[in-house]
From Swiss-Prot:
Belongs to the glycosyl hydrolase 13 family. GlgB subfamily. GO terms for biological process: glycogen biosynthetic process. Keywords: Carbohydrate metabolism, Glycogen biosynthesis, Glycogen metabolism, Glycosyltransferase, Transferase. GO terms for molecular function: 1,4-alpha-glucan branching enzyme activity; cation binding; hydrolase activity, hydrolyzing O-glycosyl compounds. It comes from Nitrosomonas europaea (strain ATCC 19718 / CIP 103999 / KCTC 2705 / NBRC 14298). Catalyzes the formation of the alpha-1,6-glucosidic linkages in glycogen by scission of a 1,4-alpha-linked oligosaccharide from growing alpha-1,4-glucan chains and the subsequent attachment of the oligosaccharide to the alpha-1,6 position. The active site is at 413 (nucleophile), 466 (proton donor). This is 1,4-alpha-glucan branching enzyme GlgB. Its EC number is 2.4.1.18. One of its GO terms (cellular component) is cytosol. Pfam families: Alpha-amylase, Alpha-amylase_C, CBM_48, GlgB_N. PANTHER family: 1,4-ALPHA-GLUCAN-BRANCHING ENZYME.
Length: 734
């Protein structure tokens, strides 16, 4: 290649120069960097903010010739050191800098990784894309890579180049759509974005890195180059135990938590991840929770979205600290015997212009047609699960959380909206699949791939589906035609139970089926029984405020609700604040009302929750056969007039507990309950206990069998059944 000073008008060099100076150069290495020349090598650099540039050669620093007033410099000769170093001076400011030329370095991404990425099978795309601190030919710097197949030009911009898209244009890997650039000598923690020019419209977009692992604190949204901090994990024992964990038969009691509103400093500041660990872990242990589930902590711009509109699928939100601080939080949870589950949102993403939306000027991560790609309820875009690179992106996001942060499970949000093309859409607002149906075939394939990957790559890790329809086999293996989730939230149980509990007790006998219907389908899936954040927002009222009656009855009903939940078949999840008996809905901008614990009724709710949790954890009959019909049997589900139900929960060794629940405010003395043998019984739990601020009606001492058959059982006992309360009984000799 000839130097610009000797090129003829209209030459390719003139064209490349024009494209560079107007930020339209598709292939920067065709113009910048090292090229063959008659006298050895031609080095060409673009430094628009420098007055003079020298090239380090075997003969020392040699001045480069200015060939364009906008900052193009050339040097031609022999003895070039590789990779070559530049010394640059801005004579106006007196600033002198030394750094290597990015265009002296080859691209590093392998063709194999690009192939897998384009095939939708690269499970660790976060190693390929994004910003990475690497060494290239002995020089330390940052390698940037981004997928933008419809771009004419992509540049890395930041404070380090005055956000000038002409300075660091990236190089593209053939037809893969992946752009790459190694910038040597770039400091750790530098803020950056990608400037993208669409090749059709010429639109210029400024986008944050979809694969970044750290972003600026909101409201800013630039990505940060990685800071080398290798975390020293100390949870080897936990991970080893998890691999062999028999979760089907184990207790699983989840505390659902929003990091920013559990507790705050007196001045309203968030707890950091370290501070959260200091306060939360002892609380979880004391209260008897086995796991904590965090509402989404991937980076998101809006507090009020609760994290469900993510813009950083590989980044812990900077609101509460660094990635290393979150690793420490998870590590400390594991060392304390607490598992950590994350809410993860592959169903949709926000319209924010700095993020995924129309990333390269086209519908890249979403569908072009809003009938497929836009969610009217949430004002968000829907991922295009049929696009392989989007599949690699989402699978890699899940892999990253489980690998980098040792997460124990993912709760997948809004699964129903993924499965149905006509979800929350009217006629004419959706497009059928290739068979004319309403099933989203690509989303089904993605979910199966996700679950297969999680269970295969991370033994013992769990996946939970928040799926609100009757879609079959959600928690059955993908190889058997299911979606492959470990468990599914039982939204039917939740809706029926809360509907029943909100009826005035005098009318509950007309809605008795809302208590009993669940047993018709309770074992068709591996169910979790949720009393989640979604039920205490948007005018639905707090759990306490949902309950009918006067003040005492509200608390009694709430105690009864929690007793029913903890004794029903299925794993458990409760949202933070439920255990306090909060009087108003969850407010994301405030901490929980901890001051309520100064009052007896609220202390009673917390004490009941604590005792129920520990009873559940330590009683095999209450958890071993949650997913199996042999773990439950009715004693009496027909006492409609008195709104009482009774049932047994069974363990694998044949032991059992007897549960009797009274959903009316009537104290029932002399209430007869059928029993399966002739043992005496004793009360092991009573939600009406004085310790829970109840009326303290109950059953002291042994309860002897009467010898009278009852409710299809060979014998029976007579008990006192407290008002709006539940009792749990065990055989006195068991």
């Amino acid at each position: 290649m000839k130097s610009l000073s000797s090129s003829s008008p209209g030459s390719s060099e003139d064209s490349a120069q024009s494209l560079l100076l107007t930020a339209r150069l598709y292939d920067p290495c065709s113009f910048l960097g090292m090229h063959a020349a008659p006298n050895g090598r031609l080095i060409r650099v673009f430094q628009p903010y420098m007055s003079r540039v020298w090239l380090h050669t075997l003969s020392g620093y040699q001045p480069m010739r200015s060939v364009h007033q906008d900052g193009i410099f050339e040097w031609e000769g022999e003895g070039v050191m590789h990779p070559y170093l530049l010394r640059m001076e801005n004579t106006a400011t007196g600033v002198i800098e030394e750094r290597h030329d990015p265009y002296a370095f080859p691209m590093q991404i392998s063709g194999h990784d690009l192939y897998l990425f384009n095939e939708g099978r690269l499970l660790q795309a976060y190693h390929m894309l994004g910003a990475h601190r690497v060494r290239n030919h002995g020089v330390t710097g940052t390698r940037f890579a981004v997928w933008a197949p419809n771009a004419e030009r992509v540049s890395v911009v930041g404070d380090f180049n005055r956000w000038d898209g002409r300075v660091y244009p990236m190089m593209v890997h053939g037809h893969s759509g992946v752009w790459e650039l190694f910038i040597p000598d770039l400091p750790e923690g530098a803020i950056y974005k990608y400037e993208i020019r669409n090749r059709i419209s010429g639109e210029i977009l400024l986008k944050t890195d979809p694969y970044a692992t750290t972003y600026e604190l909101r409201p800013n949204n630039a990505a940060l180059t990685p800071i080398e901090q290798k975390y020293d994990w100390k949870d080897d024992d936990w991970i080893a135990r998890r691999k062999g964990w028999d979760w089907l038969h184990a207790p699983l009691n989840i505390y659902e938590l929003h990091v920013g509103s559990w507790k705050r400093h007196p001045d309203g500041r968030f707890y950091s991840y370290h501070e959260l660990a200091d306060h939360l872990i002892p609380y979880l242990q004391d209260m008897g929770y086995s796991h904590v589930e965090l509402l989404p902590i991937s980076e998101h711009p809006l507090d009020e979205s609760w994290g469900y509109q993510a813009t950083g699928y590989f980044a812990v939100t900077s609101r509460y600290g660094s990635p290393e601080a979150f690793m420490s939080f998870v590590d400390r949870c594991h060392q304390a015997g607490i598992g950590v589950i994350l809410d993860w949102v592959p169903a949709h993403f926000p319209q924010d212009s700095f993020s995924l939306a129309r990333f390269d000027g086209t519908a890249l991560y979403e569908h072009e047609d809003p009938r497929l790609g836009y969610h009217h309820d949430w004002g968000t875009y829907i991922f295009n699960y049929g696009r392989n690179e989007v599949k690699s992106f989402l699978l890699s996001s899940a892999h990253y959380w489980l690998s980098a942060f040792h997460i124990d499970g993912l709760r997948v949000d809004a699964v129903a909206s993924m499965l149905y093309l006509n979800y929350s859409r009217k006629e004419g607002e959706w497009l059928p699949n290739r068979y004319g149906g309403h099933e989203n075939l690509e989303a089904i394939e993605f979910l199966r791939a996700l679950n297969t990957m999680v269970h295969g790559e991370f033994p013992g890790a769990l996946t939970f589906a928040e799926e609100s329809t009757s879609w079959p086999a959600v928690s059955r293996p993908a190889y058997l035609g299911g979606l492959g989730f470990s468990m599914k939230w039982n939204m039917g149980w939740m809706n029926d139970t809360l509907s029943y509990m909100q009826h005035d007790p005098v009318h509950r006998r007309y809605h008795h089926n809302e208590l009993t219907f669940n047993q018709l389908y309770a074992y068709t899936e591996n169910f979790v029984l949720p009393l989640s954040h979604d039920e205490v927002v948007h005018g639905k009222k707090s759990m306490l405020d949902k309950m009918p009656g006067d003040g005492w009855q509200k608390f009694a009903n709430l105690r009864l609700l929690f007793t029913y939940q903890m004794t029903c078949p299925g794993k458990k999840i409760n949202f933070m604040g439920n255990e306090l008996g909060q009087g108003h809905e969850w407010r994301v901008g405030h901490e929980l009302d901890w001051y309520l614990l100064e009052r007896d009724p609220h202390r009673g709710i917390q004490a009941l929750t604590r005792d129920l949790n520990h009873l559940y954890l330590n009683t095999p009959a209450l958890h071993e056969l949650d997913f199996f019909a042999e773990g439950f049997s009715w004693i009496d589900c027909h006492d409609v007039e008195q709104s009482v139900i009774s049932y047994q929960r069974h363990a694998r060794d044949g032991s059992f507990v007897l549960v009797v629940l009274n959903f009316t405010p009537i104290l029932r003395t002399g209430y007869r309950v059928g029993i399966p043998g002739s043992s005496a019984y004793q009360e092991v739990f009573n939600s009406d206990s004085i310790y829970y601020d109840g009326s303290n009606a109950g059953n002291a001492g042994k309860i002897s069998p009467t010898g009278q058959p009852w409710s299809g059982q060979p014998d029976s006992i007579i008990i006192t059944l407290p008002p709006l309360a539940g009792v749990i009984l065990k055989a006195a000799d068991g």
